[in-house]
Amino acid sequence: DFRPDYLFLGTVVKKLGTPLVLALTATATKEVEADICRILFSDRKIDKVRCSVDRPNIFLDIEEVENDAQKDELLIGLVEKMRGPGLIYFSSKKKADETSRMLGRKTGLRVAAYHAGMLFDERYSVLQQFLHGELDVVCATSAFGMGINKPDIRYVIHYHIPLDLENYVQEFGRCSRDGKQGRIFRKRERPIFAYL
């Protein structure tokens, strides 16, 4: 159900004469992987390669906060302290907008929001500014993710925790793809055991 149009890829591959196909994913569950294999490679032998998602260069940090005011205070401190580009993930478009304005005012950093409620041109502009080092921080919903590869993102903060482990891993996977040190912050809001 992630990308319904992908269900038609098997038909397209057959219409093209069954050329060689390479399917890659960083976050597919075993069930989704089985669906991909069934749809794309139903009548062919395939080779699967799996790699670890372990990223020893990324430090996961949990900060305990009591309320939203304390969370915002902590957020300001983290953003001021961290070096390099950063992402802050939200489950609310409104909160992403509000926090981007607040961080810009209180830190003097170059901050913008990114979410599906924005016009395409606005989102594209924010993405290009971030990729070219013209923004320090992006306050985003999960709309900021797929296909975005900025190797030097040094930290990811989860203001709100994603609903499932797959999205959590995908979002913090944006951090430090160049192999240098990175940090992931989240507040103690929901026990990590909820994902197990």
Which residues does each predicted region cover?
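Helicase motor core with emphasis on the C-terminal RecA-like subdomain
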Residues: D1-L196
